[in-house]
């Protein structure tokens, strides 16, 4: 199911990616260009990137495992 937003492919500046950290674990993030998401493997969360802006709010993150609750 979709929330009505059109997915527009974007990219993340590698220097910005070096500065960003997961707000839950403070760990590194990995860019997933296919899904426009920043992945925190340690937290098991995927943060959306909308209009080129990372949305680093835990409440907006998608669990990587659908049955896993958000931290």
UniProtKB/Swiss-Prot annotation:
Residues spanning the signal sequence: none
GO cellular component, one term: cytosol
Source superkingdom: Bacteria
A Pfam cross-reference name: Trm112p
Matches recorded under PANTHER family: PROTEIN PREY, MITOCHONDRIAL, ZGC:162634
Alphabetized HAMAP family for the sequence: UPF0434
Family designation: Belongs to the UPF0434 family.
UniProt-recorded name of the protein: UPF0434 protein Meso_3270
Organism field: Chelativorans sp. (strain BNC1)
Biological classification of the source: Bacteria, Pseudomonadati, Pseudomonadota, Alphaproteobacteria, Hyphomicrobiales
């Amino acid at each position: 199911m979709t929330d009505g937003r059109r997915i527009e492919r974007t990219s993340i500046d590698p220097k910005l990616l070096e500065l960003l950290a997961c707000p839950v674990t403070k760990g590194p993030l990995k860019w997933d260009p296919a899904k426009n998401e920043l992945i925190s493997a340690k937290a098991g969360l995927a943060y959306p990137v909308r209009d080129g802006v990372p949305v680093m709010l835990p409440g907006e993150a998608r669990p990587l495992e659908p049955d896993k609750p958000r931290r």
